[in-house]
Amino acid sequence: MGDDAIRSVCGYGQIDLEHAAFSDDARVVLYAEDELAMDHFAIYELPVPALFQTTNGRRTIRVSLAYDPPVRHSRNDYVGVGMSFRLVRGCEPALISEHYRRRPRDEAVPDIANRFQCKMAPGPQSREKSTLQSATATFKTDISNYGDRYYIVVRCEAGWATELDRQRFAIVVQVAHEAEIQIYQQIRQRIQLRG
């Protein structure tokens, strides 16, 4: 059985509430509850400490998105609104915003090189069919050349549910390193400085 078949039957597995809700020294959990207008997007900044980037070992950034669109059980496209996310690194927010903004078909889209778009598993083709999406970017080498800020782009795309003008959603991000390094305090300080 392949990963897609297992996920289709079992979902993302059994929840560990404590693991999902709390951080520890080498694993940080961040979340936001928000809403987006149809055919709009939001960019969330994710601080990535130097210690996480350069310390040897396996490190992951896991993004999970959940939303509650109107549904019809009698349609092939049963979900009335589509949502998706991407994890981008090494780019300025202005370039990301320009890339994802809605534009006329004849207008060129500024490119974001593949090296700046984090490869996540499962990929977008598999996960975007669902109202609960989760994917992980895994890094094994030094990633400091991409900078200390990554960005999560959350998009909301109108479907057949024309009576809806905004869609609620929640997003959770887990930043984790297999080495027992102190990233919680570093991320917390950077978030408090912004707040």
Which residues fall in each region the model found?
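Hydrolase catalytic cores
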Residues: 1-4
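Exposed aromatic-hydrophobic patches
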Residues: 44-50, 135-142
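Secreted peptidase-domain scaffold signal
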Residues: 8-95
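Extended low-complexity, serine/threonine- and proline-enriched intrinsically disordered segments
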Residues: 60-128, 168-174
